[in-house]
UniProtKB/Swiss-Prot annotation:
This is Laminin-binding fimbrial subunit ElfA. PANTHER family: FIMBRIAL SUBUNIT ELFA, FIMBRIAL SUBUNIT ELFA-RELATED. Pfam families: Fimbrial. InterPro entries: Adhesion_dom_fimbrial, Adhesion_dom_fimbrial_sf, Adhesion_dom_sf, Bact_Fimbrial_Adh_Pro. Disruption phenotype: Mutants show significant reduction in adherence to several cultured epithelial cells (HEp-2, HT-29 and MDBK). Coiled coil: none annotated. One of its GO terms (cellular component) is pilus. It comes from the Bacteria. It is found in: Fimbrium. Gene3D superfamilies: Fimbrial-type adhesion domain.
Length: 179
């Protein structure tokens, strides 16, 4: 019986020592590192401009008879920026992504899905109305101003051959690069 009590006592002492030793080796402290960044964007894009629809005027097919001929009826494409801070950056470029026309590679292809006009594309321009904006290509430098501003681009119909009447549609997603 003494052996049983002694054996039980030794077992309890060993088990307690093991638990205490395990607690001494347990990892109870650590650290968490947080990384982040507060940015000061140059401008904020006005929400109404983000996904806008520009309705072009109707143009007679007789104004678009030969490849490269434009209708001469340019339509404004306004992009509104607000809260611009030129202490952050003074310049921007735009990239208008979309499907380039196969004949007029500087123009956006007509993507109308029903009753589409043929031999017609859409040519975008910088605000001067003469500097063409090629799809998927960065524009020239645009000087930003402090506060709110509207950057105005232009668009016009351009013939890729003798145009026929019908719908014209193109979509371009744009990206602003501040530098």
């Amino acid at each position: 019986m003494k052996k049983s009590v002694l054996t039980a006592f030794i077992t309890v002492v060993c088990a307690t020592s093991s638990v205490m030793a395990a607690d001494d080796n347990a990892i109870t402290d650590g650290s968490v590192t947080f990384n982040g960044k507060v940015i000061a964007p140059a401008c904020t894009l006005v929400a109404a401009t983000k996904d806008s629809v520009v309705t072009l005027p109707d143009v007679s097919a007789t104004k678009l008879q030969t490849n490269g001929q434009v209708s001469g009826v340019q339509t404004d494409v306004p992009i509104e920026l607000k809260d611009c801070d030129t202490t952050v950056t003074k310049n921007a470029t735009f990239t208008f992504n979309g499907t380039a026309d196969t004949t007029q590679i500087t123009a956006f292809a007509n993507q109308a899905s029903s009753d589409a006009a043929t031999n017609v594309a859409l040519q975008m321009y910088m605000n001067d109305g003469t500097t063409a904006i090629k799809p998927d290509t960065e524009t020239g430098n645009i000087l930003l101003q402090d506060g709110d501003q509207t950057l105005t681009f232009k668009v016009d119909y351009i013939a890729t051959g003798k145009a026929t009447s019908g719908n014209v549609n193109a979509v371009t997603n744009f990206h602003i690069n501040y530098y």
